[in-house]
Structure formats: structure tokens, C-alpha cells
Amino acid sequence: MHIFKRNYTKFILLLLLSLFPKTILFAQENSLKTKYFTIYYAQDCSLAQLADRLHAASFLHIDIFPQQNNVQDIQSIVSDLFDSLYLEVSDIIDIHMYSFEGTIRIMPGREELREILGAYFKKVPNVASFYSHANNTIYFSWPDLTLGVLVHEMAHAIISHYFVVPPSTKVQEILAGYVEYSIRKKAGLQVVK
């Protein structure tokens, strides 16, 4: 009976998350629409910090924080950055889906991420990010979000939507790891071999 209640509770939580994702767990967040993603982020997540963390200047070839008064709109910079990274990931794995639309949720911390993961796993892993194919959403912990983590999860999203029968977990991890390596190298970041 206990197993039934636990599975029933998970089912109800997943159902509610898929029907009313913004109203249940994500009431204190902002959103940003890009060509390929709708990004929901915690109120304490600064878009300027996000652009800096993701090394926007490396991919958009702009000065994010100009010294003069011609400051660009940070929302358009972040939007362009996510779309540019999506296209870069697509180029690396040679999978191009221009009609792709996904969701990204940047959670305030790992505890909030663990709450969501509890709906998917009996034993909740302590991870910085997670891609859910079921609702086409990438989840991140704000303190742990880096360029490498973002493109790794983007690769999972692209791979999951391209193949009718998704590759094994090991193959997906190899491809996502290669994407992460390639992007970090292109951005001039330290590459772990």
C-alpha cells in the first residue's frame, strides 16, 4: 500500500507540474522568450550575471557592458545568447532542428531542483542540472549554472528530440560531453581531458 501511495503521489505531482507548471512551484519567477526556448528564472537571478557566466562576449561578439551610453537591452542579449548556443550545439553534433521549442527553468538552488527531481526518481540525485524529455524542460540550479552545464543539457534536449529511439544513456553522455568540451574550448575556458 505504501508503494502505491508513493507512486500515486508522484503521478499527481507530475500531472500538476505538466498542467500548471508556473503556478505551483514557480510562482516567484520571471520569464524570457527566445526563438528556441522559454526561459523561466528565479527573481534573484540577474540576467547580466547570467550573460557574464555564459561568456556571452565569446559567442555574440559584442561588448556586454559598454562604457558608453549605448547600452544594449540585457534581455535581448540573453535571448540571442541562448539561441546562439543552441545553434552552436546543433552544429557540433550536426543535428539541426530549426522548429525546436523547449523550456529552461533556472531554480534558485539545489534544494528547489531536488524537489522537482523527487517527482522523477525514488532516490533523488544531487545534481546541478537535469533534462526531462517528458516535458521538454531543462532544469538548472542557479548557483551551479555554467556554460558547460548549459550546453551539455541542450545537447540532451536536441538528441532526445531528433532520434525516434533515443540512443543509450552512455552514448548521449558521450555526445553531450563532447559538446561541452567543444564549447568550453571555443570560449577559451579550461578544458578537462
PLM regions and their residue ranges:
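Auxiliary, metal-adjacent structural segments of Zn-dependent hydrolase domains
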Residues: 72-134, 192
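Acidic/histidine-rich, surface-exposed loop or edge segments in extracytoplasmic proteins
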Residues: 33-73, 158
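Post-HExxH zinc-binding segment in Zn-dependent metallohydrolases
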Residues: 166-193
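Bacterial N-terminal signal peptides that target proteins for export
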Residues: 2-12
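Bacterial N-terminal signal peptides
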Residues: 11-22
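Soluble non-cytosolic domains of exported or imported proteins
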Residues: 68-83, 140-149, 165-170
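Boundary at the C-terminal end of the N-terminal hydrophobic targeting segment
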Residues: 25-29
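Active-site recognition of the HExxH zinc-binding catalytic motif
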Residues: 148-161
